[in-house]
Amino acid sequence: MRTLIAFEEARQIVLDAARVVGPEAVRLGDAVGRTLAAPVTSRDDLPPFDTSAMDGWAVRLGDVRDLPAVLPVVATVHAGEVPAATLAPGTAIAVMTGAPLPSGTEAVAPVEWGTASEGRLRLDRAPEAGQFIRRRGEALREGEEVLPSGTAVTPGAIGLLASLGVHEVAVRRRPRVAVVATGDELVGVDEAPGPGQIRDANGPGLAAQVAAAGGAVVGTLVARDTSASVSAALAACTEADVLVFAGGVSMGERDLVRTELERRGVTWSFWKVAQRPGKPLAFGVLDGRPVLGLPGNPVSAAVCFEVYARPLLSACLGHADPLPHSEAGRLDAALPTAAGLHTFARVTARRDESGVLRLRPAGAQGSHVARSLLDSDGLAHLPASWDAAEAGAEVTFQRWAW
């Protein structure tokens, strides 16, 4: 097992261990936030017929060449109706937005360009050929790929798929994640801590991060600092695709997670990463399942989850690019660095008048300052090679995905 490896290498090792989960079929209305397991192709042309883009009149170009043009209005077509007749030369047909256009229509003149009274239309402006006509198949052709596999289903995608008659989609099932917080000092959130005890923040916090990342929590467990308790927690994780531990992977005599996992045959890839916060981070594979050992400090655990576990779950869901979105930003104030350690600084972000993303420290940067997770917009990545991070320095900014 390697120790104190670089952040970039550690993250790639985690991603390389991801196994894409299987598919399941869900109703369209339940697919928001899920990931497509297969491409979706259009069953029809969209729109399915030539339609009017405006309220107005269907006309032939030769009839409106000389202005003002005066034409009899011989019919009206509303959305949902079928034109009863062809547009004959020398006539106009009133059409509403979305209405099918009668055969013979060469353009639509919007209502703002003319007036109609007692069945006669006067046009003071002529449309160009095809103007204000939405052609059949203009948006999508039958058989055309609408959304590729690996796409996250958004509300906008739901509307598009509904318009194509898609009522059920194949999505990746949610990766099953077991979250285990460790420590004799932990009590439940509904309990009053006794002397030397604290409420468990890691279990509920990490479970929420799993859900926000598209996973399904199959257990939120607390393991005491005994081999028997850690063993019992591991035995309860058999259904999980991914195991996430908070605490128990450091060098203390009661950090028993590593020992118990090794007894069960885990293959460790690394232990300790050259980063801050989250230096005591461990990763391995047990029976083909990724095992991520996070620090016990809640801030360090939350940060490491976003940097490592969220991309891992995205890869398990089959996302083409599982890495979190990042962008360039500029520091408005100096930030502390640590020699040889990649630093994740909690920062606020705002754009100035010129469009530059300005980053400022979100208060104290200690790994015990849980409030900084709420007060910040994301993480500024300060490379391990930097001796200092001065105001004005350009850095990579990773916005919180929650």
Label each PLM-derived region with a short phrase.
Residues 16-52:
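An N-cap/entry alpha-helix motif that binds or orients negatively charged groups
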